[in-house]
Amino acid sequence: MERGEGRRGDCSVQVRKKRTRRKSDGPDSIAETIKWWKEQNQKLQEENSSRKAPAKGSKKGCMAGKGGPENSNCAYRGVRQRTWGKWVAEIREPNRGRRLWLGSFPTALEAAHAYDEAARAMYGPTARVNFADNSTDANSGCTSAPSLMMSNGPATIPSDEKDELESPPFIVANGPAVLYQPDKKDVLERVVPEVQDVKTEGSNGLKRVCQERKNMEVCESEGIVLHKEVNISYDYFNVHEVVEMIIVELSADQKTEVHEEYQEGDDGFSLFSY
């Protein structure tokens, strides 16, 4: 009986202790722990010794299907989302220490800044942080699920933009870059004078061709007249009569006689032609 009672007493004593988290205030609070690590780092810097850089750690976060809806889209170090939407931050203490709970926050950005503050206090200049000292980018490591759906989904174009895209192309004018849409009236005013110029040029060319053709006809007619004038007919002359006239003239020259008469008391000559 005594042994049984002793065993029952041992079982009642071996009760599982509940794990308690550090409070934000108090002697063993989160703030006191961070302060203590900050003092340790200052001592190391004064001794010209440096602490080993922390490990990169895993960026997996929660297991697949665990955590909040936006947990898989967040890449902040030491930050994860609960199933009910709250964001929490944790950091592991140096020298393979235990994880330090930094608290829960309404946004992932606040949780990331809390992690950076604790990391600089624990690891000093070798700390791996989410933001640099001069960086204030709030969307560098976390993107909400709706925004990702909008970026990955099909792009929707408003009706006004569709009308603009379906409108005729714009014409770029010379000079400064000014885009304008041509009007039908302007196009007609610019095209009609060109058509008229073409018509006038065509009519002038036709007139010039006709005039040249007329000149050629006149020249041909004048040439025909001249040719007719040159080709004179000899029907108006009698060849036999002309020959007889030539013979008569030759015979008259042969019948010319010169008589020299010498008379007493006259020293000259006298010529008589018959």
From Swiss-Prot:
Keywords: Activator, DNA-binding, Nucleus, Stress response, Transcription, Transcription regulation. Signal peptide: none annotated. Its main location: nucleus. SUPFAM superfamilies: DNA-binding domain (SSF54171). Disulfide bonds: none annotated. Induction: By high-salt and drought stresses. GO terms for biological process: positive regulation of DNA-templated transcription; response to stress. Residues 75-132 bind DNA. GO terms for cellular component: nucleus. Residues 1-10, 35-50 have a biased composition (Basic and acidic residues). It holds the Pfam family AP2. One of its GO terms (molecular function) is DNA-binding transcription factor activity. It is found in: Nucleus. SMART domains: AP2 (SM00380). Transcriptional activator that binds specifically to the DNA sequence 5'-[AG]CCGAC-3' of the cis-acting dehydration-responsive element (DRE). Binding to the C-repeat/DRE element mediates high salinity- and dehydration-inducible transcription. Belongs to the AP2/ERF transcription factor family. ERF subfamily. This is Dehydration-responsive element-binding protein 2A. It comes from Oryza sativa subsp. japonica. The lineage of its organism: Eukaryota, Viridiplantae, Streptophyta, Embryophyta, Tracheophyta.
